[in-house]
Amino acid sequence: MDEFEEYRNPLTKRYASREMVCNFGEKRKVILWRQLWIWLAETQKELGFDITDEQINEMKSQRDSVDFGTAAAEEKARRHDVMAHVYTFALACPKAAPIIHLGATSCFVGDNADLIMLKDGLNILLPKVARCIDRLAKKAMLHKSLICLARTHLQPAQPTTMGRRICMWIQDLLLDLENLERLKNHTIRFRGAKGAVGTQASFMDLFQGDHQKVIKLDEILTKKSGFQRSWCVTGQTYPRKVDIEITNALSNIGATVHKICTDIRLLSSFHEVEEPFETKQIGSSAMPYKRNPIRSERACSLARYLMHISTSMVSTVSVQWLERSLDDSAIRRIVLPEAFLAADACLTLLQNIAEGLIVYPMVMEANLNSELPFLVVERILVKMVSEGAANRQECHERLRKHSHEAAAEIKLKGLKNSLMDKLLNDYYFAPIHSLLPTVLDPSYMIGRAVEQVEVFLNTEVDPAIHSYKDCLALNSNITI
């Protein structure tokens, strides 16, 4: 069949990195199953089972040579993917066949392999989050003193700095970094060798009731698989609430990326910032002048999918009847890999945007100046009262009247902001006419914005990404 005749997941084909795609690939999964069977046999041998080095070496030699055709035919006949691969591996390892999967249940390979892939997925994402933080931190430091107009409700509010605004984006990413680190270091544990319903009964039979050997089996397998701990109590599967924790954290990344890229799109519409735009890039087939923020738009599109993906894991947990039902199987095959692929794609885009983000200081200044007279009205009121030149209520009313007249001229006639001219022409405000230039200086209105940027980057950001310093240099390239 031609590759263009069948549906291909766009996350795999267009958006996610090859590293993440391969991490959840079918071949990787089956090789992990085989590695788990090898570790099981090795550990059983260490604990006294009659298993030979020849059998183990045979399994190792055939680990990566997977006959997927035979496995597919067996699964069609047996309706059981793990048993199909037990059969296929046994065909390739006739001497080891009697001891493959000895005492294990399907979830010994299925769940434990999933946990390894999930942990490795986190290890792929963590440096990507750190690189996004690093790139934005550089922009924040560069623009820590660049004054711009802050907006609340998407309406003019007060002056801030572009660096300070970027730090708000970084703060959300820091929370995402902490979430992923918590998952990797504390939440995800190995399922281990727990048997069909979690009681380890099959292994108790194999070890003739020797509790210590069963405990040791679980401990050794946990360490061999790269985990510090295994779950003490499970059903047939590891606790599916782990899947909720993981997808929630990934959904949070989606929310962060969506917020940042939406902000960039909004600022782009004000001509204050612009995402990278290639020399030969075309914004519109009909409008040659267009410079659309397509990377931010794509990131938002992927992020919306990612934000809603965790709800399926919540409902899956709720239908895990007693020790287990198979309600989890099909949906986990789809949701867990796609959540990681979507998060991977979002972070790759965000890093690329951050690396090439263009800032236009002159436009920021012009936009700020157009609103600045309104923003200083409260300062003028305070100055008038503190100089003993006015009654507060009377002054407030005059300022209100002049402000509304100036606003009406802007909206109805398209004129420039004339509020300061009105105040200069009103003898009532004569006591502070000489102070108006100082009042209009926005550098007096940004509070501790610059200092906050410096403190935040030095005391919170740098320590958070220090452990990733060896992988921060990698740039993000978008080819589509």
From Swiss-Prot:
It comes from Schistosoma mansoni (Blood fluke). Homotetramer. The active site is at residues 153, 284. Catalyzes conversion of succinyladenosine monophosphate (SAMP) to AMP and fumarate on the purine salvage pathway. The lineage of its organism: Eukaryota, Metazoa, Spiralia, Lophotrochozoa, Platyhelminthes. Its EC number is 4.3.2.2. Fumarate binds at residues 80, 236, 285, 290, 292. It is an enzyme of class 4 (lyase). GO terms for cellular component: cytosol. GO terms for molecular function: (S)-2-(5-amino-1-(5-phospho-D-ribosyl)imidazole-4-carboxamido) succinate lyase (fumarate-forming) activity; N6-(1,2-dicarboxyethyl)AMP AMP-lyase (fumarate-forming) activity; nucleotide binding. Keywords: Lyase, Nucleotide biosynthesis, Nucleotide-binding, Purine salvage. One of its GO terms (biological process) is AMP salvage. It comes from the Eukaryota. It holds the Pfam family Lyase_1. Coiled coil: none annotated. Disulfide bonds: none annotated. The gene is ASL. Belongs to the lyase 1 family. Adenylosuccinate lyase subfamily. It catalyses: N(6)-(1,2-dicarboxyethyl)-AMP = fumarate + AMP. AMP binds at residues 14-15, 79-81, 236, 298, 329, 333. SUPFAM superfamilies: L-aspartase-like (SSF48557). This is Adenylosuccinate lyase.
